[in-house]
Amino acid sequence: MASESSPLLAYRLLGEEGAAFPPNGAGVSGVPSSRKLSTFLGVVVPTVLSMFSIVVFLRIGFVVGHAGLLQALAMLLVAYIILALTVLSVCAIATNGAVRGGGAYFMISRTLGPEVGGSIGLMFYLANVCGCAVSLLGLVESILDVFGADATGSSGIQVLPQGYGWNLLYGSLLLGLVGGVCTLGAGLYARASFLTFLLVSGSLASVLVSFVAVGPRNIPLAPRPGTNASSVPHRHGHFTGFNGSTLRDNLGAGYAEDYTTGAMMTFASVFAVLFNGCTGIMAGANMSGELKDPSRAIPLGTIIAVAYTFFIYILLFFLSSFTCDRALLQEDYGFFRDISLWPPLVLIGIYATALSASMSSLIGASRILHALAQDDLFGVILAPAKVVSGGGNPWGAVLYSWGLVQLVLLAGKLNTLAAVVTVFYLVAYAAVDLSCLSLEWASAPNFRPTFSLFSWHTCLLGVASCLLMMFLISPGAAGGSLLLMGLLSALLTARGGPSSWGYVSQALLFHQVRKYLLRLDVRKEHVKFWRPQLLLLVGNPRGALPLLRLANQLKKGGLYVLGHVTLGDLDSLPSDPVQPQYGAWLSLVDLAQVKAFVDLTLSPSVRQGAQHLLRISGLGGMKPNTLVLGFYDDAPPQDHFLTDPAFSEPAEGTREGGSPALSTLFPPPRAPGSPRALSPQDYVATVADALKMNKNVVLARACGALPPERLSRGSSSSAQLHHVDVWPLNLLRPRGGPGYVDVCGLFLLQMATILSMVPAWHSARLRIFLCLGPREAPGAAEGRLRALLSQLRIRAEVQEVVWGEGAETGEPEEEEGDFVNGGRGDEEAEALACSANALVRAQQGRGTVGGPGGPEGRDGEEGPTTALTFLYLPRPPADPARYPRYLALLETLSRDLGPTLLIHGVTPVTCTDL
């Protein structure tokens, strides 16, 4: 539990020796700080190189040639709108607090929780793994175009053998080079990336100059794979220079077969390839653990990189459309080299871009994997990824990722992987947008990012656009990715994860609950929609576990509050003793599997504490209308924690994770004869207080004897037939007459019916006992009662019971303390209570009837079949001096009846209208 002194942010200024910690928690005990990268080297450079990847050199012609300039621009605009929406969300989350290693995974998991964050983090990791393989395959393709045995053109040095096995070998060798750089750490990676950035920038500059400086030329096209070069006439593509007719020819779409795969291209397939090249916006965020100031570097560097790459793509699209015919664009994806003033510089750019993109994907994947392993979401399967070097470099995660990339290289074809990689990236982007949307909708005061150029509209549009594009690109891959995410989330939920990160779902639920509680108007309540809202007062849950579960069954979709009064005076205590108890009571609710709130209070007496809880428990229109108490008798309390399987604890007294066992958090049951916290006088006074507050009252006796199968959560499969007996008559003031079922009697019928609707009680039969006066003819009253039950839609058996000469007739009286103040003496009341008890026991099969004024019973009944008995609870007497006598009569009335509920209802709860 957080205290007043608990910080809102875990941020330490000084270490143990007084040395200042690095910002954002960079310093880790025993591990040197690895936060060395600036905004430019840590975010701008890797993001630009990842967003260019091989697309900028090898797929510009592919996109423009198949889609045409207009559709290519539309694709680029759509792609960058999606990216921009996600970038806004990334910037908002990154500027709302300290960002540690793991990048997008860290943001998602700390917002949506470990289940969703872990599943999407693993998928984003796989997307980076596949992205690394795609970049390497593109690099192999570009190398073989020049140096392969089947390469065409006079500039080709045809020394490298080709084929699936050779291509796999080349990719594996390049992967070894990339993995070696990443294994040596982020510092070497940053220097290599900067060198690569310079090479790529120089290469792109030479290409842009070549579009203007080179004159028209014919460029020979290589024969398609699988064709005999000698039997196919030589074909040429044309570089026309800036030409208006070339631009007009390239404006519209011209989808054809991809000469590398033979597959027919469509808008979706071309967009997948283009978008895959633009999906590197998280490259900088993935390096969050190595950035000096990630909260500033991530938003600033990402925005700069996105704007720069968008401008370069637009420029290349226009230049290609103005100068190259469609045949050249569609049949020679590496035409930049053919039109360059110095072709080797383009080759250097291609190789450098592909290498840098693969390095960025591999090192980003390793950081995500290391963060997943540190959070221990997937157990020992990711244990090797926790290994770090002395400088904090997670080389174990790098080697782990290297092995997975090697497996992906077996797929072989660049465009084959593009759709899957794109869909996985889109899932991660949608999750980032959803995280920001959730934080914005939750309206939590601590969500106040310094980056404010976003709103819930941009977040929602980002989520929708990502999901739409997923299914547009590949419906199968999109459906499979969502299914995979669901399975991983279910796995993590079943396994359990850290709960200290915070769940935005809790903030969203609070926001929605508050909104609807304000709309829940008590002035609009109607008896048709009445439901029980219970406040169960418990002294020690060890002895009240069956009652705890029975009350959970009685609530029927209503409110259930578990209340407890701690005796004490806050003025004489150094701190509030109630707050530390909440955790134990919430654990009790979880283990007992009941749907209850917990409300604790501190009071000098139990009676005053009960008054507090009756007045202040609940909120708005959700406040208790019924008080439930255990019965006050001399029976020794039982410790149900010892016999209930849900509460069985390890021998050492600790639960999983090292937390104290629940059995150690509650005191042992009260020993027989020991003093009680509540006197008989205060017990009856508490009942009287509840009735004065217009609350219904339920007193539960002997609930520990309930059949265990009736307290289970599922349907009961008990072979024994059980009854639920209802006596809707004040047995301490017997009377006949046509109107004896009053408000309290109807409340009994309602509560018994509610219990019969619970699956565990479906097989139990509801019996209602109709008490007849000595001069009342049988049949007539039963007919009236059956008509009433029919109107109330209550299915039950009706059994007539004839009282002796002591029964009264007439309408029920509303006099408080009816039987006590009704003129009967104590001896007569005691005799009547004994007679009523014998009557009920006889109908249960617990014994035969005897005594004056007793009913006609059934002798020789075999064993009790009644699982639970509902009895009418009379009002307490008006004179507090008679409270002990009242309690003694209740004890006599309910003695040896087994599980019994004595109920007094004060509010109408039934309705016969539609």
Curated annotation (Swiss-Prot):
Keyword Transmembrane annotated: yes
Membrane-protein topology: Multi-pass membrane protein
Intervals, Cytoplasmic compartment: 1-36, 94-119, 189-193, 284-297, 360-376, 438-466, 762-914
GO cellular component: lysosomal membrane; membrane; plasma membrane
Gene Ontology BP terms: inorganic cation transmembrane transport
Residues of this chain annotated as glycosylated in UniProt: 228, 243
Topological domains annotated Extracellular: 58-72, 141-167, 215-262, 319-338, 400-416, 488-740
Molecular function as annotated in GO: chloride:monoatomic cation symporter activity; metal ion transmembrane transporter activity
Family recorded in the similarity comment: Belongs to the SLC12A transporter family.
Protein name in UniProt: Solute carrier family 12 member 9
Organism: Mus musculus (Mouse)
Record gene name: Slc12a9
